[in-house]
Amino acid sequence: MSDLHNESIFITGGGSGLGLALVERFIEEGAQVATLELSAAKVASLRQRFGEHILAVEGNVTCYADYQRAVDQILTRSGKLDCFIGNAGIWDHNASLVNTPAETLETGFHELFNVNVLGYLLGAKACAPALIASEGSMIFTLSNAARYPGGGGPLYTASKHAATGLIRQLAYELAPKVRVNGVGPCGMASDLRGPQALGQSETSIMQSLTPEKIAAILPLQFFPQPADFTGPYVMLASRRNNRALSGVMINADAGLAIRGIRHVAAGLDL
């Protein structure tokens, strides 16, 4: 029997990409899975596909009331919450400082940080009482952009660095009751979109980066699928396999940390 059998897991952005892969993996592990998903169509698809194995709640990660509504439903269903996985996010499609108009930069910043940073903070706030009671864990999705420049533009990179700081602070504040960690994947096949303020809400990451381009920069030389990244989340959520890790960021980046993103300078053509 899996360590996660009957554990109550709450994942944001479970309708596609990495979030969907996490939903699938934790259900396979025997967990009671819930997700907060913005898209009504994706919520309907999750319910149709997984039936009683999923509690899919339509809501926005930038709204605390939506989080609280989801947590209330989780506690009614499962009687507890063991792990919160903050995963929903948006990317900036490498929008650069020089080429982004000032007014767009400002509105794009607020939209992206609201999702990528405030969304994590609000989720942590809503889940903290239940996780303190269960002595559970929080896991947040980061990125190679949480460590290196070049994994996005300044908006995205700054948001992931901010999320790293949030993980460390929450790990400090919530110890010894709650373990708080992060997983930093590299690029993968997903439907990751950008901010509406930058005109990117209908543009997925795969329209900006080809599989060949992603594979070429990775030392392991393959194009990752979302399921390739679920293992670290399972390990971090497991009480038996993770008794000692908190405030840790796992780089699940196909070896990118060996050398980083090697461009001498991005502004050579300025």
Swiss-Prot record:
It catalyses: 3-(cis-5,6-dihydroxycyclohexa-1,3-dien-1-yl)propanoate + NAD(+) = 3-(2,3-dihydroxyphenyl)propanoate + NADH + H(+); (2E)-3-(cis-5,6-dihydroxycyclohexa-1,3-dien-1-yl)prop-2-enoate + NAD(+) = (2E)-3-(2,3-dihydroxyphenyl)prop-2-enoate + NADH + H(+). InterPro entries: BphB-like_SDR (IPR047950), Dihydrodiol_DH_HcaB (IPR023643), NAD(P)-bd_dom_sf (IPR036291), Sc_DH/Rdtase_CS (IPR020904), SDR_fam (IPR002347). The active site is at Y156 (proton acceptor). The keyword Oxidoreductase applies. One of its GO terms (molecular function) is 2,3-dihydroxy-2,3-dihydro-phenylpropionate dehydrogenase activity. Substrate binds at S143. Pathway: Aromatic compound metabolism; 3-phenylpropanoate degradation. One of its GO terms (biological process) is 3-phenylpropionate catabolic process. Its EC number is 1.3.1.87. Keywords: Aromatic hydrocarbons catabolism, NAD, Oxidoreductase. NAD(+) binds at residues 10-34. It comes from the Bacteria. Belongs to the short-chain dehydrogenases/reductases (SDR) family. HAMAP family: HcaB. Converts 3-phenylpropionate-dihydrodiol (PP-dihydrodiol) and cinnamic acid-dihydrodiol (CI-dihydrodiol) into 3-(2,3-dihydroxylphenyl)propanoic acid (DHPP) and 2,3-dihydroxicinnamic acid (DHCI), respectively. This is 3-phenylpropionate-dihydrodiol/cinnamic acid-dihydrodiol dehydrogenase. It comes from Shigella sonnei (strain Ss046).
